[in-house]
């Protein structure tokens, strides 16, 4: 590269992936070399607790085309991806996981689609036989719900394995929000997009950090990031409950005045109170999610802090402490120097 921007940057967020990095590089580097393009590989350590950073440092020492971006703590995968995008110097960036579930060989097709003029190319995964029925049902329901409640139409199997050209990268870097749902942002920015299917492999080592609780949190973040329909649903629910209560009250008054029927007390009262209380609590919870997002946005904290940045070919000071805030693209740019 000789100081010039590489054609491709491969951004790999890592969290406790020490056992997977060497096998990944053994497959990834030959694929990139076979493309005949200049490239850099950026390993983004998201506060790993194992030897991930140590292994990454050894790989970078052996191959100057490998760079390291170590965050000061664990900020989560969405922020780690954002940090990698901020520091990617290539004309296009390929995002992929470190666990080898994203086959490096698929990069050949992603690069070919980029040559055809597409600016965002998604590798969409097929359903894995090892996935449980409950997880498949939850994922399918989320994609359908997001499509119904927002203008973001995520295809089934779309993830973080994708190629983004420089225009898309700059668009993503300009976005200020803190609670980020990157899969939705890839589609929201627009540009010419294409999908390429692939068969995901099993993890070669270690266990996934994603459980149902974290997946639910990501889904909730995605819904609140791209839709205000839940707020409208809470209002509609309140109107319906009020309407039902008025109808029920009219029925009771009619029974008493016209038919002399005694109004049953505690059963109907308790059912009404419990139902109304449930609707109120759900509405407050939905409102709280949006208020919490507003609170986090108004704090204007940096998205992340960088504890150690050593770019490919060593063009920056290692060990420097820096930060980046999506509210200020200039601050994000400062971390790349």
Indicate residue ranges for each PLM-predicted region.
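Conserved amphipathic alpha-helical interaction elements at protein-protein interfaces in regulatory
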Residues: 30, 34, 58, 62, ...
